[in-house]
């Protein structure tokens, strides 16, 4: 682990977490049963991980710290699997099973689709 890698992950994580927090502040109260801020963070993260994987695969000469900054740091700070899990459990514990499953489908299906779209974007434009 290099010192620059450590800094890259930390800076990226802070930026990603701040963006996730901003999404939550702006959109979670709109629909507490399916918080849109968490969904937006996970869907954007799904798309951007596809873009990042495609980009870094085609730009292997870039220093590894750039990938650490973008993928491990920023996208790790942005995406919110633990928050997503607690929100789904809140639906289930409240007896809102259909909303809980909608929540799961929206996050997982949407993120997988957008990851594929991100890869496609880089390959098409690349």
From Swiss-Prot:
Na(+) is not transported, but it plays an essential structural role and its presence is essential for fluoride channel function. Keywords: Cell inner membrane, Cell membrane, Ion channel, Ion transport, Membrane, Metal-binding, Sodium, Transmembrane, Transmembrane helix, Transport. Coiled coil: none annotated. One of its GO terms (molecular function) is fluoride channel activity. Its main location: membrane. It catalyses: fluoride(in) = fluoride(out). It holds the Pfam family CRCB. The chain crosses the membrane at residues 6-26, 36-56, 68-88, 99-119. It is found in: Cell inner membrane. One of its GO terms (cellular component) is plasma membrane. It is a multi-pass membrane protein. InterPro entries: FluC. GO terms for biological process: cellular detoxification of fluoride. Na(+) binds at residues 76, 79. Belongs to the fluoride channel Fluc/FEX (TC 1.A.43) family. This is Fluoride-specific ion channel FluC.
């Amino acid at each position: 682990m290099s010192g620059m890698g450590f800094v890259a992950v930390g800076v990226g994580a802070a930026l990603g977490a701040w963006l996730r927090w901003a999404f939550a502040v702006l959109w979670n109260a709109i629909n507490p049963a399916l918080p849109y801020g968490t969904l937006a963070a996970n869907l954007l993260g799904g798309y951007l991980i596809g873009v990042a994987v495609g980009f870094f695969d085609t730009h292997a000469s870039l220093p590894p710290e750039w990938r650490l900054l973008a993928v491990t740091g920023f996208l790790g700070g942005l995406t919110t699997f633990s928050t997503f899990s607690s929100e789904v459990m809140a639906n289930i514990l409240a007896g809102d099973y259909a909303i809980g499953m909608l929540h799961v489908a929206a996050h997982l299906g949407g993120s997988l689709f957008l990851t594929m779209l991100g890869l496609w974007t880089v390959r098409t434009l690349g």
